[in-house]
């Protein structure tokens, strides 16, 4: 942090008051986690400073994907996200992304089990794919990974899955993707995978518990320190309720609903 440049206004405020300079434990952890070259701070973090009463100026790194490396803002206020789990597809656009999202269908059906995409069958597990995506995207891009089974009754198993994500991507990049479940529940989810793949329960016939299953799961995971990407909503009005689950991101597939309505 000794080479950190301060804005003139901040320098004027601190001049004569700072006796010591130090980095926070999080600052050090970020640098070590991403093996940042000397003299740099990584993309995806803004630099914050706090002056203590004893004259100690603490320098911290706070997660913020609107920042490029060395505390410089990205060129525009629009942040780009991609929906893919194909490392070969992601690599060319990686420097331009602030977020990546994927779900089990994208990971397994469109990539791992697709010989045209998974060239030479190089990848066999989701963990291998996530590791490679993390390497390609670097520290500046959040990665939203959807739970394999949001209907899992054992919450400890869901936490175990999230811990695996965190060990691969780090707590700084991981965003857990939780779907709005609507009328789908553990007893009828198989209908979406069998036969005509249509659900026998209408969207407006969901029980209260089923309709809010995703919301409550998102809240529980947030209480355990995870950032949440709340997804799979098709109506604008659903966003207001989703905000009650305190997500980090919201994915509303309004375009799908609009297309269906105009068909």
Mark where each language-model region is:
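Long, compositionally biased, glycine/small-hydrophobic-enriched stretches that function as flexible linkers
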Residues: 1-77
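Context-gated lysine
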Residues: 2, 17-19, 28, 69, ...
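Active-site beta->alpha loop and helix N-cap motifs at the rims of alpha/beta catalytic domains
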Residues: 45-61, 76, 81-212
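Surface-exposed amphipathic alpha-helices with a cationic face
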Residues: 62-74, 134-135, 163-166, 213-225, ...
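Generic structural signal for short, flexible, solvent-exposed coil/loop and linker residues
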Residues: 69-71, 89, 95-96, 239
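Active-site glycine- and acidic-residue-rich loops that bind
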Residues: 81, 153-156, 225-234
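Catalytic alpha/beta core domains of metabolic enzymes, predominantly
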Residues: 196-219, 226-263
């Amino acid at each position: 942090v000794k080479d950190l440049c301060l804005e003139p206004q901040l320098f004027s405020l601190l001049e004569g008051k700072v006796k010591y300079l130090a980095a926070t434990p999080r600052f050090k952890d970020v640098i070590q986690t991403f093996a940042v070259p000397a003299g740099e701070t990584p993309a995806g973090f803004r630099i914050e400073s706090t002056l203590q009463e004893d004259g100690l100026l603490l320098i911290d790194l706070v997660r913020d994907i609107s920042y490029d490396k060395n505390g410089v803002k990205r060129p525009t206020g629009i942040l780009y996200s991609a929906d893919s789990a194909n490392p070969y597809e992601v690599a060319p656009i990686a420097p331009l992304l602030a977020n990546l999202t994927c779900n089990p269908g994208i990971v397994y059906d469109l990539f791992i089990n697709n010989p045209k995409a998974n060239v030479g069958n190089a990848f066999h597990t989701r963990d291998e794919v996530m590791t490679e995506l993390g390497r390609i995207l670097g520290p500046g891009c959040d990665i939203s990974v959807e739970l394999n089974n949001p209907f899992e009754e054992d919450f400890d198993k869901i936490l175990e899955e999230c811990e695996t994500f965190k060990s691969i991507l780090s707590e700084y990049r991981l965003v857990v993707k939780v779907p709005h479940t609507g009328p789908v529940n553990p007893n009828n989810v198989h209908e979406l995978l069998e036969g005509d793949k249509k659900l026998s329960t209408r969207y407006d016939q969901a029980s209260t518990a089923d309709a809010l299953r995703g919301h409550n799961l998102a809240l529980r995971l947030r209480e355990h320190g995870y950032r949440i990407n709340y997804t799979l909503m098709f109506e604008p009005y659903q966003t207001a309720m989703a905000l009650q689950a305190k997500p980090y991101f919201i994915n509303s597939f309004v375009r799908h609903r609009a297309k269906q309505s105009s068909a």
